């Protein structure tokens, strides 16, 4: 038997027995053969794979310095601005405390299983989103490219929001705050309050006129807003510097950027609970309206929020988990991060409505004061008799309860004439029912509430610093979802790619810092991510469950984790989650079709918002954003299907595991005794596709066989050979 024959499984070819006997008879001890088998995997003794920490031989891929850094990175990515200004709005809009039940159910059915799936494939294959789905099936490689495109679209406008926050942060070091009062306009004859501000409010005026200097329509660009252009540049420089340093540096940044928001939220909660009206806000928030649970819209919006809250489909989850050790318990990570995300949303909701309750109380007191003055005027004019007013009530210093009593009495006495009196009920619930989300919550409602805080500049600095940290944490994950797949696939230098990516994003982002830029932010937010990400995650679920095979994936997880995942995930991934995602996709398409595409424009003359439809070119841009985001999926599929490029994925299929251990194809084995096992002698050229050409059929046959587990490489098969002395790997 020649020593350069290639080894196959014992039950596939009798040559294996002879080869092993030949090796053992060559004056080698069992220990020496064991060492040689170790060389198959590790190439060099000093690069041996550690079975305990799961590090990979010959793989210079960076790794997290600690498990805590990784968890904080995932938390920082998933917990973002949406937890602060989107979840409270949805909770208030969809039944208060009753909304939490649909959200929790959908978190268990869609959120955690799909989050676990993305963590698993990233850790399993140790590649970014492009490499992961190319590994599953080259025809599905477009899923990874689509994730990158969506990430880039989102990063373009998300960093603009961070730029806005930087502007407000820089303006917070003033006493009083610049949005505390309306500005005065002076001319030669007299001084008067700015009309646009007087008709709206000081914080609304500051946002639309001082910060954005907004135009009245998307068609009127108005030129660049230089203040926001500088802030956008600073935001991209911060992101670029953090990403150039790599995950070790960004991981250290995460200690601050991920933990600081919780410190601020807790401080805000404690401070706001000491203010009048805060309990009214929290009570209003969590008073359940159970009848709303029967509305399909509530479940659709809860599912959408779960979907985006965890960052599914962006590629950031996969990218971060690809730097993990092989035997990391990603199931624990999925559950932990998901519930941290949920409880963060609840904490933010408590803070938001405690603060809004305080604001509503102030507005309500002003309302009562103004209406009490109107009642006094009506009494003096004789429109209302003094006899109907209880004697113990002093309208000059009336309480909420007394005003309510007087209002009810007047309403009964003047039932027919009541409408013309123009009196307001002044109920705090009416103010709390004015649902506010997004920039309206952060830059208008919340800033107005903070002007009434003692030491308001301090709280303003803390609030906007918290938003900056939340935004940067999400941006790191979003950019990682772009950089990691491209670096893994095309082997470009990360530093150069990061600089190019950020510089290009800043240039494109100038669209968003025009005076009409806020309308483009709305456009990108509505159309660049929602449907494309849903399609991406549906395809991810299908790729793992049906293309790769759910049974095979469960086996991989068992090897990787050291225990078999619950059957619950089997049924979720194979049946329930795909069905729920398809339902959500259809519901989103229907909702988008029923809702006319448009935006809320700020009309200066009216000092109020007005809904406007997009012009025809705007419609084209909206449609193009959705098409461009998902276009890589069919393009790559067609290219692979028609064999327009090489369909080989051997370079992606060369890594596998056994009981959480890394097994990798050998390289550069000239002069190594272990090359005998591979049939490699110094005079032979190495196979260009090593992972696919190592399985020879019957002796003498030139035909090559990829074997049932050919994807895994020779290390996986050899580890299971009963007569081969198993190494410590």
UniProtKB/Swiss-Prot annotation:
Keyword Phosphoprotein attributed: yes
Positions of modified residues (Phosphoserine): 25, 55, 687, 699, 701
Activity dependence on pH, as recorded: Optimum pH is 7.5-8.5.
InterPro entries: B(0)AT2, Na/ntran_symport, Neutral_aa_SLC6, SNS_sf
Gene null: resulting phenotype: Mice are viable and fertile and fail to demonstrate any striking abnormality in motor and sensory functions. Other transporters could help to compensate for loss of SLC6A15.
Family membership: Belongs to the sodium:neurotransmitter symporter (SNF) (TC 2.A.22) family. SLC6A15 subfamily.
Gene it is expressed from: Slc6a15
Ranges of the Cytoplasmic topological domain: 1-69, 643-729
Membrane topology annotation: Multi-pass membrane protein
Biased composition (Acidic residues): 43-59
Phylogenetic placement of the source organism: Eukaryota, Metazoa, Chordata, Craniata, Vertebrata
Gene Ontology MF terms in the entry: branched-chain amino acid:sodium symporter activity; neutral L-amino acid:sodium symporter activity; proline:sodium symporter activity
Glycan-modified residues: 187, 276, 383, 394
Alphabetical GO biological process terms: L-leucine transport; neurotransmitter transport; neutral amino acid transport; proline transport
Any Gene Ontology CC annotation: membrane
Subcellular localization(s) per the UniProt record: Membrane
Catalyzed reactions: L-pipecolate(in) + Na(+)(in) = L-pipecolate(out) + Na(+)(out); L-leucine(in) + Na(+)(in) = L-leucine(out) + Na(+)(out); L-isoleucine(in) + Na(+)(in) = L-isoleucine(out) + Na(+)(out); L-methionine(in) + Na(+)(in) = L-methionine(out) + Na(+)(out)
Tissues showing expression: Significant expressed in brain, lung and kidney. In brain, mainly expressed int the cortex, the cerebellum and the brain stem.
Keywords assigned: Amino-acid transport, Glycoprotein, Ion transport, Membrane, Neurotransmitter transport, Phosphoprotein, Sodium, Sodium transport, Symport, Transmembrane, Transmembrane helix, Transport
Protein's UniProt name: Sodium-dependent neutral amino acid transporter B(0)AT2
